[in-house]
Structures are given as C-alpha cells and as structure tokens.
C-alpha cells in the first residue's frame, strides 16, 4: 500500500499514522490480537482529521484540491463508467494529452466524457502538461462535443486544471480563440451538459469545458477566475499574499453556492477524496445520475434557454448597507 502524502496542516496526524502502521505490521508478523488498539487509534485519527478538515481556510482547500493523490478524471472513469472508449485528436494535427475525452456508459445511459488529466509523478505530469491544455485540447473537446450533439449523447465534463497553458506556442496557436469558440458553441448544444470541478478549476482553462446546465464541485475543490498566486502577484506584486487572495476570490463551494455559480457541492470523505476515492466515486456517480435524470426530461430548447439564463445571471453584486443609506439620502 502506497504511503499517503500528508499536507502541512495534516502533520499533527503523522504520529498517529505511524502508530497505526506499526500496529498493522505487528498484526501481520505475529498472532497478537491488536484489533482493539488499532480501532481506537483509527477512530482517534479519523476524529482529528475531521476536526482539521472542517476548519480549512480557502488557501488550505487549494492544497487539498492540488493533492497529488486526489482522484483524477481517469480514476473516476475507471470507478463507475462502463465500456470506456477514448477518442483522440482535434483533426488538425494534434492530440493533447492534458485534455481527454471519449464515450462510455454511466449506468444504462451512454454519454460523452471530457476532462483535464493531471499526472501522478513528474514524468506523467510532463506528458500531461500538468493538466494545462493547449489550443488543440480545447478543439479536440469541441469536436467530441459536436459528435455528442449529433448523436444525442449527454456531455459530462470533469474540470481539474490550474488553467489553460499560457506558453508562447499556445498563444501562437490561438489559445484565446479556441476557448472563446468553445464558450460560444457550448451554449448552442442541444444535449444536457454537466460539469464537475473534481480538483482545481482555474481560469479560462476550466471554463473552456465548463459551460454547463449544471455545475457541481466537490467540497474541497476550488473554482477561480485566477490562481491566488497570480492574483497576489498582479495586485500586490507579492505571491506570498496568496492566502489573502484566496479568501478574497471566493473560490470555495459554499461561497460559489451563495453567488449562484455552483448548483451543488458534493460532500467529501473525512480527509478529502484522496483518503477514500471509492466513496468519492460513489458520491459523484449518484450526483451525475440524479442531475442527468432531471435534465433529460427537458427539451433541447429548454436546455439551451436555461443554460443561457444561468450564465446571464452571474456577476451580481451586493452594495453595503452604508452605501445604500448614502444613496437614499
């Protein structure tokens, strides 16, 4: 069993985790019954873990969303999808490995799946470009979404990216245009679209596959117009102010629910999805099936009109009481 990667704020759990590992080794190597001690330590660790994760700051949630062992797009596909067939290429000479897509079944329903894919180690991350898609990736996604629209297949997208790739080659190939075309065309699609932020949802890279009838996100996922590090560098010329930027950006599920951007926040296991990936998979599958059932009852015109209205309502703001008082005077 691979050792869990602990984040900085999880370090108080290290001693307990070490004790649990030692007792498990003792149980394997001898006939001594240590089940009671093991149960007590595991219960204590679970309680402390829950206390820590119930009090996470936005900056700490970003660390959880970026956790190297957090389930990825392909992990969820393997957990609850049948007959997965990956489709390749944008038909313009590229096949971006940072953004994948293909056909599968969820339960009895055939769907098109698209999503960003990060790597587990340095070699795989380089191959996947750390989940940052280039223009060819977004054009591949659009080609597959057009295919789904033609054959009346619901579209399920998994968002997990720090942002679209911002290198020189991406700009030369039309990164902004590729994302903009996706935004325009996703509003025109006649099939249900459900997007889920499974980890990090960063900037236009997330929005390029995120124009959906329903937007879901996990409890410790984040969805933001810019990374807190980038925001802090722009506003204060100091990336060290990223925690303050994270709080100001309103990137967490509860904040985004209040703003009317997210439709449902999915509960995570104690310690995050990386602690119990199968449980996370069950949660996501149940949510997708529920929302898919509701959306399939709508006509194509209703889907498109509701989708357009949903995004037109975004961007509301509230004035403070003092400002309202000044205006009334």
Curated annotation (Swiss-Prot):
Keyword Methyltransferase: no
Keyword Transmembrane: no
Classification via InterPro entries: Acetyl_CoA_COase_a_su (IPR001095), ClpP/crotonase-like_dom_sf (IPR029045), COA_CT_C (IPR011763)
Gene Ontology MF: a single term: acetyl-CoA carboxylase activity
Pfam family, one: ACCA
UniProt GO cellular component terms: acetyl-CoA carboxylase complex
Gene3D superfamilies: 2-enoyl-CoA Hydratase, Chain A, domain 1
Cellular location(s): Cytoplasm
Pathway the protein takes part in: Lipid metabolism; malonyl-CoA biosynthesis; malonyl-CoA from acetyl-CoA: step 1/1
Record note on quaternary structure: Acetyl-CoA carboxylase is a heterohexamer composed of biotin carboxyl carrier protein (AccB), biotin carboxylase (AccC) and two subunits each of ACCase subunit alpha (AccA) and ACCase subunit beta (AccD).
Function, in words: Component of the acetyl coenzyme A carboxylase (ACC) complex. First, biotin carboxylase catalyzes the carboxylation of biotin on its carrier protein (BCCP) and then the CO(2) group is transferred by the carboxyltransferase to acetyl-CoA to form malonyl-CoA.
HAMAP family hit by this protein: AcetylCoA_CT_alpha (MF_00823)
NCBIfam families per UniProt: accA, AccA_sub, PRK05724.1
Protein name per UniProt: Acetyl-coenzyme A carboxylase carboxyl transferase subunit alpha
Organism: Prochlorococcus marinus (strain NATL2A)
């Amino acid at each position: 069993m691979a050792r869990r990667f602990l984040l900085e704020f999880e370090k108080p759990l290290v001693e307990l985790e070490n004790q649990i590992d030692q007792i498990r080794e003792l149980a394997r190597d001898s006939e001594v019954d240590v089940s009671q001690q093991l149960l007590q330590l595991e219960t204590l660790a679970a309680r402390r873990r829950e206390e820590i994760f119930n009090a996470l700051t936005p900056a700490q949630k970003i660390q959880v969303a970026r956790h190297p062992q957090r389930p990825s797009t392909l992990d969820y596909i393997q957990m609850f999808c049948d007959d997965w067939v990956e489709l390749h290429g944008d038909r313009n000479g590229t096949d971006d490995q940072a953004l994948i897509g293909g056909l599968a079944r969820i339960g009895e329903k055939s769907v098109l799946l698209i999503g960003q894919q990060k790597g587990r180690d340095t070699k795989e991350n380089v191959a996947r470009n750390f989940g940052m898609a280039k223009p060819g990736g977004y054009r591949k996604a659009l080609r597959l979404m057009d295919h789904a629209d033609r054959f009346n297949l619901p579209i399920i997208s998994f968002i997990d990216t720090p942002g679209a790739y911002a290198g020189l080659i991406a700009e030369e190939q039309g990164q902004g245009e590729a994302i903009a075309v996706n935004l325009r065309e996703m509003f025109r699609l006649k099939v249900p679209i459900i997007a889920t932020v499974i980890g990090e949802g960063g900037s236009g890279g997330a929005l390029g596959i995120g124009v959906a009838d329903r937007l879901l996100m996990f409890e410790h996922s984040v969805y933001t117009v810019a990374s807190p590090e980038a925001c802090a560098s722009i506003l204060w010329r100091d990336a060290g102010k990223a925690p303050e930027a994270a709080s100001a950006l309103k990137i967490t599920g509860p904040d985004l629910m209040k703003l009317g951007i997210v439709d449902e926040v999915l509960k995570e296991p104690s310690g995050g999805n990386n602690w119990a990936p199968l449980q996370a998979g069950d949660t996501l599958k149940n949510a997708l099936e529920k929302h898919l059932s509701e959306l399939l009852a709508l006509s194509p015109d209703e889907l498109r009109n509701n989708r357009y209205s949903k995004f037109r309502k975004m961007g509301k703001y509230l004035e403070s009481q003092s400002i309202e008082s000044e205006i009334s005077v």
